[in-house]
Amino acid sequence: MASHAQRSRILDAIEALKQYDRCRAVELLREELRQGPPSGERWRSVSRLAAQIGEIDIAIEAARRYSRTEPPSLERLLHYWSELSQYDRTDKAREELGRLSPPLRRQPNVLHLLGTLAGQEGDFAEAERLYREALALNPGQPQTWFALAMIKTFAPGDPDVSAMEALRPATERVEPSIRARFLYGLAKAWHDCGEHDRAFALYSEGAALRRAEERWDPAALERFVDGLIRDFTPEAMERLAPSGETRPALFVNGLPRSGTTLVEQILVSHSRVADGGEVNLLRAALIPTGDHSLDGALRYQQRMAGRADPWGELAGDYFRLLEMRFGTRDLVVDKTLAHSHFMGLLLHMLPGARVVWMRRDPEDTALSCFRTYFTSGVAWSWSLEDIGRFFRLEDRLHAHWSAMFPERIMTVDYQQLAAHPAHWIPRVAEHCGLEVEPGMFESHRTRRGVLTASVQQVRAPITTTRIGTSAAYSKHLEPFRRTYRG
């Protein structure tokens, strides 16, 4: 049982965050690690809180202590190893997995995790082998069928489709999010087989399950976007003190499924760029600004009136979190979703930052979003109408920020990049302050872990085959067209 002091430290950390005092919250979590017990169920909550504010080292250590809780539990260990893989500590995860006894190593959920690790690293043949081994032991694992569906291409008459259809009635008894994931996998199978109407019905069924669990409030986001566009003007931003942190930083922004992972992969293929991903660290660094509005930024600046470089401090914290995440001070590519909501503060805080903003055909992007089972943070993607509303807001933000920062934001059209990489890759490199290197033109050969839904696409050469993919679903996209075009 946790002592009163231990409970108080965690509650005090939460209270500090409510006051936007991120530094105090981190101090309390570090103190908890120093003085807290070596194990216990409560460490899972500590890990989750630390992850939310970007303190990955604390999150990992707390997850490790949770995994050591008595009595021994494979489920807790799997949670810890999954956290390690999420933060690119796959070598450590594999090391511990390798110490399991042969019977434990052949548990279906262990095989599933090993398959996930293999897939993230681009070894799809090994991932498929491990998933099939898991399914041979337990054919009724919906999540493993989904994982297998994401890395293979189905064909008419594929026995895997029949096996998934046979399992479908049983999935009605599992929790909705797991059933939804399975339905997305089955939909992808029928999509591969060219059965687009059947696939769309399954995607819609899965999306309805997710929508019932996770509602999106378009009116709230519209108010937020209205405020950003109204308040963040060149004249208003002159009220913010300049940032003294001039280190370069690379960002790739754009809607999900718009080609952001492709550009990330191209940049990571440069010798000066160490890695990249959806790291979710800028939001954490900006916690002291509160709601990320201009008023919040001015309040933060007022609280820090006695400090020499308040915006440089936030930038330094961001770079510290990046170094913790990737283990390097070299350049990394941050392609976290929805940086458009913080773009004004991002470019003010990081005067050395350069942004590549991807744009893609709206209907192709909308369909791809609707067909993707996002794990979190994309509640608008469970409805074609909501996708249209979200895209309209993002269009407004792109127009606003690119007009305000034309020298720092480069807009790249996915269709043009895919069709003419020899023209666009040098332009992207120049914008990011990089010399062109041959490896950037063969980015699919760059080996690294990829955690996004584009894990397969970045392993293949740049191609135009994904342009126009929405045509097969055109009759189903009318709800998107109505809300997007107004």
Language-model segments: which ranges?
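PAPS-dependent sulfotransferases, especially Golgi type II membrane carbohydrate sulfotransferases
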Residues: 146-152, 161-173, 182-246, 301-302, ...
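Residue at a conserved register position within TPR or TPR-like alpha-solenoid repeats
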Residues: 16, 50, 84, 118, ...
